Every structure is written in structure tokens, then in C-alpha cells.
Amino acid sequence: MKTLLDVYSDYGSIISFSSEAGNMLAKNVISQVPLIWKTNVSTSHNIVGSLAFIDDSTYVCPVDSFYIQVEYAPIGTLFTLEIYSDLLDPPSYSYSVTTTAETEVLTLMADYQTIGYFWKLVITPPSSSYVKIGRVMVGQAWQPNIGPSGDVTVSKNPFIKSER
């Protein structure tokens, strides 16, 4: 069974679900992803999220893909996906891809067996510019007979307005 969490990158962000399982309604995102990241040379920007089932936060599911729709990023912008069991520990999995065009769709694939409570998307432009992300989608997979079958939520660390 697979759930695709669709995180729209604007100030009215919601998460919508596309899954083999029914009755999964859209949930409001706690902290919206800023539409544009203003950058300095070699400045990295992080989007950090947690993976948990609403009705049982102790059940951990594997992340198998991130789909990122890049509206604009300088050629050579590095996107890195990191999966964590604990944000204080080194990532249990890391995968990077570099943009080859200013507008493109990126798919960051994780090992299907990678288990984590947290994910981090690190965006590193090659020069002083900005990055505009149109959509971020998170692919999760889990065994249908293990763990709960309820809603899935993603919570993100809050952004301070001055940092946007």
C-alpha cells in the first residue's frame, strides 16, 4: 500500500492524499512551506518534517520517494533528501540530485527499506539567487496488515517570518 502526501508550497498549503486506502481526507499543514527562498552564495535551506500516523505515532513507515516540482532554481542547485530516526543523529539515508535546467521535475528515491521518523530536504543553490518550488510530494509505503490504517499527517518545523 502506498500513500502520496502532496505538500503544496504556498502560504495556504494543505496536504492531500492519493492512496489505495480510502477515507483519507486532506489535513492542514501546521507550518506552510515558503514559496520563495532568498539566498546568499552557498546558503542551504532546509524543509524538515516528521512522519507519523495520527492514530498511532509509534508506527514508523518507510519513505520511498520525494517528487519536487521546481518552478525556478539556478542550474546546478543541489537537492538532498535525508531520512532520520532522530534528528540529533546522522541521517540513516541520504540521496542528492543536481538540477540541469532552471525548471524541472525532480524525483528523489529513497531505499524502500529506509525507516525514519523525520525527513529533511536540503536545497543548496550554487550562487546568489532564489529558489521557487511549486510542489513537494512525499511517497510512503507500508505493510497493509501492520500498524494502523488511519490518516497520515506531516508536521513541519515552523518558519520565522523574517527567515522567509
PLM region spans:
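Disordered, acidic Ser/Thr/Pro-rich linker "stalks" and the adjacent N-terminal cap
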Residues: 1-56, 147-163
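Residue-level recognition of well-ordered beta-strand positions that form the cores
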Residues: 67-69, 82, 122-124
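Flexible, glycine/threonine- and acidic-rich loop/arm segments that mediate assembly and lattice contacts
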Residues: 72, 88-90, 94-96
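Exposed low-complexity, polar/acidic, P/S/T/G-rich flexible segments that act as propeptides
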Residues: 63, 125-162
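Beta-sandwich interaction modules
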Residues: 50-62, 93-135
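Extended, low-complexity, turn-rich repeat/linker tracts enriched in Gly/Pro/Ser/Thr and Asp/Glu
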Residues: 70-78, 127
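Short, surface-exposed beta-strand/strand-loop-strand elements in extracellular ectodomains
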Residues: 75-87
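A short beta-strand element within beta-rich, extracytoplasmic domains
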Residues: 61-73
